[in-house]
Curated annotation (Swiss-Prot):
Expressed by the skin glands. It is found in: Secreted. The modification Glutamic acid 1-amide is found at residue 31. Signal peptide: none annotated. Belongs to the frog skin active peptide (FSAP) family. Dermaseptin subfamily. GO terms for biological process: defense response. It comes from the Eukaryota. Its main location: secreted. Has antimicrobial activity. One of its GO terms (cellular component) is extracellular region. Keywords: Amidation, Amphibian defense peptide, Antimicrobial, Secreted. This is Dermaseptin-7.2TR. InterPro entries: Dermaseptin_dom.
């Protein structure tokens, strides 16, 4: 189904955004 592809794409984007945010927070804390 098309909506499954959309959800998968949103999930992937959210995952990458979350990792990027965590990385930024970790960098900020370690400095």
């Amino acid at each position: 189904a098309l909506w499954k592809d959309v959800l998968k794409k949103i999930g992937t984007v959210a995952l990458h955004a979350g990792k990027a945010a965590l990385g930024a927070v970790a960098d900020t804390i370690s400095e």
